[in-house]
Amino acid sequence: MFGIGARDLGIDLGTANTLVFVKGKGIVVREPSVVALQTDTKSIVAVGNDAKNMIGRTPGNVVALRPMKDGVIADYETTATMMKYYINQAIKNKGMFARKPYVMVCVPSGITAVEERAVIDATRQAGARDAYPIEEPFAAAIGANLPVWEPTGSMVVDIGGGTTEVAIISLGGIVTSQSIRVAGDEMDDAIINYIRKTYNLMIGDRTAEAIKMEIGSAEAPEESDNMEIRGRDLLTGLPKTIEITGKEISNALRDTVSTIVEAVKSTLEKTPPELAADIMDRGIVLTGGGALLRNLDKVISEETKMPVLIAEDPLDCVAIGTGKALEHIHLFKGKTR
């Protein structure tokens, strides 16, 4: 057996954001999963927030990209470089680093063996002594303080940037789960497409995300908020300002929300009766950034006829759970697909 020290890390390697948990300190890194590169030399210009601020604003020889897509690695070398940057950030105050850290890194529950191997290899290349995968919904459940090690059913719905993870958990394992590549990014795309088709206006990812956060809702609100947005008129090519309503955005998000709700319902249908009874008592717990979409908890509750709760600190649950799982790292040793 190997000891777990204060230098070991839990990493929530997300499509939208990367969080790093250090044992004894909590979350010490919280940055967008974005890297800015020189197109000719492939050298790194910026990582994280600095790189995200460059999206849509870079000169021709610099490109800001997200090396993760739908919860898996889309650009291996860039992901490894980004992870190395964040690992170094997390341990920069450790003085002379006695040894490389063990790293617990989250992966989507629907990932393939090849995709999981890429995450493990990238984590090792980034400076880990060794890397151990933990399924995202399991980490989210730990971070949400659900009784995952007990013989009782817990249900978590983790809505991240690239994937939505739905899982029933009992006795330290996932009983049944579903991973769909529909989540926060898909919501942003739906808003972009709606604005383009309805107003002939092109907006960027950052504007779409701001719209979602400010006036987005899983169902049409009784009193609709308005929001002024700017983009490029596709007819004239010139900048243009329009005003949109919350009801419009809830309509734009309808299909995405419906897909997430169907994933929740289909997972419940595969749940053993005893565990379903536990979930009816305890409720379905929502985690991830998507849990913050207004009225999503209400819509899921109405569709499933079950209580639905939003976890405390939903954005941090996966990272916290990944960090807490370091205490049980021996259970994950050699546990790959």
From Swiss-Prot:
Subcellular location: Cytoplasm
Keyword Signal: no
Keyword Cytoplasm: yes
Pfam families: MreB_Mbl
A GO term, aspect molecular function: ATP binding
GO CC terms: cytoplasm
Null mutant phenotype: Disruption of the gene results in loss of cell width control. Depletion leads to a strong defect in chromosome segregation. It also leads to the formation of enlarged cells, to the loss of mid cell localization of the replication machinery and to growth arrest. Double dynA-mreB deletions have strong cell shape defects.
Activation/inhibition comment: Polymerizes in the presence of millimolar divalent cations in a protein concentration-dependent manner. Polymerization is favored by decreasing pH and inhibited by monovalent salts and low temperatures.
UniProt xrefs under SUPFAM superfamilies: Actin-like ATPase domain
Keywords of the record: ATP-binding, Cell shape, Cytoplasm, Nucleotide-binding
The family this protein is said to belong to: Belongs to the FtsA/MreB family.
Entry function: Forms membrane-associated dynamic filaments that are essential for cell shape determination. Acts by regulating cell wall synthesis and cell elongation, and thus cell shape. A feedback loop between cell geometry and MreB localization may maintain elongated cell shape by targeting cell wall growth to regions of negative cell wall curvature. Filaments rotate around the cell circumference in concert with the cell wall synthesis enzymes. The process is driven by the cell wall synthesis machinery and does not depend on MreB polymerization.
Other remarks in the entry: B.subtilis has three MreB paralogs: MreB, Mbl and MreBH. All paralogs have the ability to support rod-shaped cell growth normal conditions. The multiplicity of paralogs becomes important under stress conditions. They are probably used to allow cells to maintain proper growth and morphogenesis under changing conditions.
Protein name: Cell shape-determining protein MreB
Species annotation: Bacillus subtilis (strain 168)
Name of the gene: mreB
